[in-house]
Every structure is written in structure tokens, then in C-alpha cells.
Amino acid sequence: MFDQLESIVGRYEELGELLSDPEVVSDTKRFMELSREEADLRDKVATYNEYKKVLETISDSEEMLGEGGLDDEMKEMLKEELSSAKSQKEVLEEEIKILLLPKDPNDGKNIILEIRGAAGGDEAALFAGDLLNMYQHFSESQGWKFEIMEANITGIGGYKEVSALISGPSVYSKLKYESGAHRVQRVPVTETQGRVHTSTATVLVMPEVEEFEMTIEQKDLRVDIYHASGAGGQNVNKVATAVRMVHLPTGIKVEMQEERTQQKNRDKAIKLLNTKVFDYYQQIELDKQNTERKSTVGTGDRSERIRTYNFPQNRVTDHRIGLTLQKLDSILSGKMDEVIDALIVYDQTKKLEELNK
């Protein structure tokens, strides 16, 4: 472990020099790759440096206690310092083990969040809207930027489908566990008998793809320009600003009309399409390898039921880790930390178990 850590420190110092090299700075792709690598190593190096200081404290305290000639007060102080340092050493060793776990290369990326109303008609579409609000409030609490990319709104205010770009530090690492089927149990607003109905919305979390990672060739792209429409389908712009893009080999389609100009809609559309196409091909590769998608939490199947939101009992249950919280109202208002932290800890614990086998 320590040889690996010394190697990491050496690489971190090398990256610091490379990132100040004008030749590297002028190469955007390489600069971004090296910046990401440096950011990934930063916590490892800082924790290891702290660990070495603690080892030094232990060594110094033991040496002084072994020399003798100390008064009782000094001995007691050194013993307390030694005990505290040994406890800190154990904590840091566990932290280092976790930091050295194989890291998901997408953890530092922004995400495209896609939510679809699935089984349950209008009620499923309304629940998709509830989930969207939950993720938006959570993003705001983290200081992340939340931007609607594409929305297909139903007549009663829900969403058949909605996509959002969430930008900021550690977005993917915290929200990657949200992909899957989310089930709601509640009395719909349209229900006159007061019966509880079950509906489902699906969530897909995709790491945002950088331009240098994925470029769609023009021959594979069809672009349609049309007039943006508002509620009821009426045209709201005299100038055609809405953009529809289709990736011909896969049939993946995106439509963008949120912005006022055609160029801004184009930029957002190509960003969304790049991410969806990249994710499509990545999923095919992972399916071929028959590997779990992204983590050990759940099967990685996008149709897997991962969580139930029970309104009558104010209960949220995450089925993958057996976590039940009587805090539905709080969680739907964006206070998701307890759920997300539990998923991260579970994932890390499972990976450590695999490593120690």
C-alpha cells in the first residue's frame, strides 16, 4: 500500500509541473485530462501526508517516553498524545483504503438526468415532476447548477419525459446510484374513492460527455429547424428557433426549444445528443461483458425497482440496501443526503470486501 502511495505522490508532483507547462496549457484536451487526474489524486496525497505526520508524532512520543527522566505531568501528556495519534492512525488507514479503491472514471463529471413517467399514466407523469423537483432542490443545496434541457409536459402539469444538465463538483459520484425505477404509492388527485394507486417513473443518470470524448459525424446527423410551440401547441416565435436532432445510426432523437435563439438550442441539443449516443454505445459494451453498470449497488439494470415512496406512511424504502426512512416529505423536498450517503458507504464496503477476499 505504501509503495503505491509514494508512487501517487510522485505522480501528483509531476502533474503539478506539467500543468504549468505552456505547451500543455495550450492543448485543451491534454490539459483537461491532466487536471482531472491531478484532482483525483489530491485527496489521496493530502490524506497520506496527514498519515505520515501522525506516524511521526507516534515515533516522537514513543522515543521521548523511552528516554526516561520525565516528570509525571509530561509522561501523562505524552501518553495522551500517543493514544490520540494511534486512534487517528487507524482512522486514516481506513480512509486511505477507501481512497485507493478503483475509482469510477466518471465520478468527477457533470450529468444529464433523464426522468420518464412510466406505468401509471397521468399519475406517473406527476410523480416524474416530483422527482425532478427533488433533484433540483438537492442540487441547489449542493451548490450545483441545474438546467432543464428537454421537457415533454403533460396537460395536468407532469412530465412524460424531462432531461436536465446538473453541473458542479462530484455530481456523478453522488447521483450515479439514482438510475432505475422509482415507485410511488399514493392517492392520485384524480381518485374519487380515496384508493392508493401505484405508479412508476424511471430515472437515468448519464455522465456528461466532453466534445473530445464523442463527436458525431455530420453524415450521421439529421437536423430539423422549426417554430417553438407553447401550451396548446401554438407557435410562440415568428423566427424558427427550435431544433430537432436525430442520430441516424441509432435513431436517438432530441428536441430543444427552451432557449430564445436557434444557436443556443443547437448547442444544448448536440450536448444532449452526444451524451445519449455515447451512453447508448457504452451500455451495449457493458451488456456484452455482462458486468454490473457503474457500481455494486443493485444489478445495474435500468428497469430495476430501486426505491419506493409511500405517501400514506411518509416512508421511503431503498430496496438495494434495505434502508427505510419515515421522511418522505423531507426527502422529496431535496434532503437526500442520508439516502445518498448510505448508498456510498454500502458501495465502498462491498468493494473493500471484494478487495480483502
UniProtKB/Swiss-Prot annotation:
What PROSITE patterns does the record tag this protein with? RF_PROK_I
The UniProt keyword set, sorted, is: Cytoplasm, Methylation, Protein biosynthesis
**Which residues are reported to carry the modification N5-methylglutamine?**
Q234
**Cellular component annotations (GO), alphabetically ordered:** cytoplasm
Does the keyword section mention Cytoplasm?
yes
- What Gene3D superfamilies has UniProt attached to this entry? 3.30.160.20, 3.30.70.1660, 6.10.140.1950
Under SUPFAM superfamilies, the record lists: Release factor
PTM characteristics:
Methylated by PrmC. Methylation increases the termination efficiency of RF1.
Q: What is its main location?
A: cytoplasm
Domain of life from the UniProt record? Bacteria
Question: Where is the protein found, in the record's own terms?
Answer: Cytoplasm
Q: What Gene Ontology molecular-function terms does this entry list?
A: translation release factor activity, codon specific
What the entry lists under InterPro entries is as follows: PCRF, Pep_chain_release_fac_I, Pep_chain_release_fac_I_sf, Prokaryotic/Mito_RF, RF-1
What is the role of this chain? Answer: Peptide chain release factor 1 directs the termination of translation in response to the peptide chain termination codons UAG and UAA.
Q: Which family does it belong to?
A: Belongs to the prokaryotic/mitochondrial release factor family.
What this protein is called in its record is: Peptide chain release factor 1
- Taxonomic source organism: Lactococcus lactis subsp. cremoris (strain MG1363)
Q: What is the lineage of its organism?
A: Bacteria, Bacillati, Bacillota, Bacilli, Lactobacillales
